[in-house]
Amino acid sequence: MKKSLVVITLLLLFVSRAQTNNVEEQGVITIVLMVKNEQDAMEKTLEPFVKAGIKSFLIFDTGSTDDTIAVTHQFFKKHHITNYVIEEEPFIDFATSRNHALDAADKHFPNTTFYLMLDAEWYLHNVKGLIDFCNLEKHKNTPCYLLRIINNSIDFSVPRLIRASSHARFEGVVHEIIPVYGSVKAPRDIYFELGVSHYGIEKSRKRWERDAALLLKEHEKNPTAPRTTFYLAQTYECMGEIEKAFHYYKLRATQEGWHEENYETFYRLGRIVERLSATDPNYTWPMAFEYFATAHNLMPHRAEPLVHMAYHYWPDGVGPSNAALCYLFAKRACELDYPEKDMLFIDPGAYNFKRYEILSKAAWQVGDFANGETATRNALQAHEMPHLLNNLAAYITRRAQQQ
């Protein structure tokens, strides 16, 4: 009898690699975090949630060889969190592994209302606001909600707040997405700040190499899938393999897909051609201009292509020989609102600084002093730079002379 009990106990130990700690107490939100070798990021990633009073956590480790799991246990122990589970399972692909994490959350946290699925080095601002939002939304049936991810150079939205009862799941081996997410966004003041540590940058480089291999394999299986083609091109662009990126963006331009990806494809083609034209005569500014113009035509409320066009006509060291063309594109860019409803790859710098900075210079040359002064003041709100202070002084002097 004792021998049988020992065998049963051993079997139970090896049925699952889950490490479970008192999961009966559940709130409106359970944090679901998929990680691998994130020992240096775990505390900072998890801390905002603990400080805001969230007590339910599922950590899905896909093969850490560092101290990620030990650091996580220590963190929860230090903060007296007992309602957590650590699951271990080898990485498969991003959609499959995330879906397995959600399956584990369903199993261990059956009474929670929402899962917030994030990555390490995604630092959530306004966790209290998220809790309040979830309490307001908990009796509705929206399957998932978009949350912003921002840093100094990018602003986009992803469906990572998931209603547990919807059983919504991800698709896509890389740059996975939940196809039923719709367009309901959490309030703008609830957002992830994307970490940019040296540690994170090194991990990004390794991930791009892995992503490229996964996407290329998927592309070979289904060469007409527009999302796969787009992200294969984008991954090569991130890796610095610009000609490969150009090839796949050109292919993506022939495939009809999501309208924001259609726009982004032509915008990135313009950027790549403009960059290559500096060293390769096979790429020219008229080619880049056509791509930028197509992008703007697809989404005329977006300023980024116009900003690139404006800067082209005011190149460093050349001066205002094309000031009128520069002014034309810069002024239109400054008339556009920040695209709050868009989800994909907004460039905050183009809206908060660049468009105003270039109009500050161009407006003077064409005699539009009022708009030039306004643009200068707007640019200075983002960056107090010496040439802008000089421009402002010139505009103020000019205005005083006209009075």
Where are these regions (language model features)?
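Cell-envelope/extracellular polymer assembly enzymes that use nucleotide-activated donors
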Residues: V28-T30
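A conserved acidic beta->alpha catalytic loop
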Residues: P48, A52, F60-T72, P90-F91, ...
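Conserved donor nucleotide-binding strand/loop of the catalytic core
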Residues: H73-A104
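Catalytic-site signature of metal-activated, phosphate-bearing donor transferases
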Residues: T96-D103, F109, Y115-L116, W122-H247, ...
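"A position-specific structural signal for the A-helix of alpha-solenoid helical repeats
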Residues: Y231, R268, R275, H308, ...
